């Protein structure tokens, strides 16, 4: 529904025409965003395309795009296999991952945890405020970070932090969900993240900002 971007944040140009994209250097003679938009407008048979969004929020956003026009847009959430993503024994999951069994664990997960849009800085700030108001959490609570570049955040928290890195093994991801007490996803903009649905399927409460499909 846009010319080139996957995350629009506060930009609403897609409602009329994408041009002079803030994600790109200032155009010198050639506006890539505008040219790409115009090429999409010329796609033959475009009016007969049925679009599928994976959340109601994305469906509603796409309907506002001038590229979509009057085309049909349906919403079908990504499926989650609840035979795989399901609740298991918390202590056993922690032992498998080498995580403490005597602490409350907060999970943050992202493909790349240093991505500013994922809101890690807000979790760091929230943990700092909680530590000032309730110093005991420095002893009884820890943060688990799942995703690429997790080790770069080791010095960001006053709370104990356990970087698990980028994990592709599905069973290990299920163990991570089952090992924690709460999943925090402070994204500034997001669709309907699979991580939230997976965590909830494992019986883990989720906390996030009221943005996008969250």
Residue ranges and their predicted role:
Residues 27-75, 80-84, 90:
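A short, active-site helix/loop in glycosyltransferases that binds the activated sugar's phosphate group
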Residues 86-99:
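A short helix/loop element that forms part of the nucleotide-sugar donor recognition site in Leloir-type
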Residues 100-118, 124-128:
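Conserved donor-binding/catalytic core segment of Leloir-type glycosyltransferases
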Residues 137-140, 147-174, 182:
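Nucleotide-activated donor-binding/catalytic signature segment of Leloir-type glycosyltransferases, i.e.
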Residues 174, 193, 197-201:
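Short alpha-helical segment that forms part of, or immediately flanks, the ligand-binding pocket
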Residues 181, 203:
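A short alpha->beta transition loop at the rim of the catalytic pocket in nucleotide-sugar-dependent
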Residues 188:
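Aromatic "clamp/platform" in nucleotide-sugar-dependent glycosyltransferases that forms part
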Residues 205-208:
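Short hydrophobic beta-strand element within catalytic cores of glycosyltransferases
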